[in-house]
Amino acid sequence: MSRVGVLVLGPAGAGKSTFCNGIISYMQSVGRRAHIVNLDPAAEASEYEFTVDIRDLISLDDVMEELSLGPNGSLVYCFEYLLENLDWLDEEIGDYNDEYLIFDCPGQIELYTHIPVLPTIVRHLQNQLNFNLCASYLLEAPFVIDTSKFFSGALSAMSAMILLELPHINVLSKVDLIKDEYSKKRLKRFLNPDPMLLVDSANADTNSKFHQLNKAIANLVDDFGMVQFLPLEAKNPDSVSTILSYIDDITQWGEAQEPKEPNDALEIEDM
């Protein structure tokens, strides 16, 4: 039987840990068993205890102190050390055969764009531990509601999709922080975006010498046709349930269950 897990990705401050806590809280309320696997050696205290914690193997603070490395160099060192000690990870998660594992990942994009750290861990989980995985990439709504920043976020989400080679959902987090400030129509433009329409807005806010670049980026996003977002309010059980239903549909959680369709996407009006 395949084991099921979801990798929670996204830049620092996107709300990854809050999302993980929201999933755990919702699952507990409906009687599902789940655990958080912390893969961030610089993680802070969480609402829910980590079942598996990379800091039990190696921590960012220890590396910075002992090797006199900066934060990014220390993070890379921590993950290279983890790759050399994957037997530790195997042992830590080896007993969770029929429970849902949520992998809370650090926000540094270079861990899968510049060095093959996360892709290597993904392959190990799939091939050695028989995990059926899904990736969820979070971008915070207050950031990407700016059109030019939206394209930046969309490119980072596409990068994760391509390099990790996992079934993937994109999540627009912290929608509750802006839904009173922006119209529903404007918010929906960023959930299922038409890049060629958004580029006109980007051009209005940037120097004319960047217009060709904006168009090229919009064409790239449009050609892939893979960047759509689900709205998330991490404290709203209905919102978390909707996101989780998409993850369940991708991973087909529970072989004994019939394959099921995801819930209807939660409309902005319902949040």
From Swiss-Prot:
Gene3D superfamilies named among the record's database cross-references: P-loop containing nucleotide triphosphate hydrolases (3.40.50.300)
Keyword Cell membrane: no
Keywords recorded for this protein, A-Z: GTP-binding, Hydrolase, Nucleotide-binding
Keyword Cytoplasm: no
Positions occupied by motif Gly-Pro-Asn (GPN)-loop: 70-72
Listed SUPFAM superfamilies: P-loop containing nucleoside triphosphate hydrolases
GO molecular-function term, one example from the UniProt record: GTPase activity
Amino acids binding GTP: 13-18, 173-176
Function comment: Small GTPase required for proper nuclear import of RNA polymerase II and III (RNAPII and RNAPIII). May act at an RNAP assembly step prior to nuclear import.
Assembly and interaction partners: Heterodimers with GPN1 or GPN2. Binds to RNA polymerase II (RNAPII).
Family: Belongs to the GPN-loop GTPase family.
Protein name listed in UniProt: GPN-loop GTPase 3
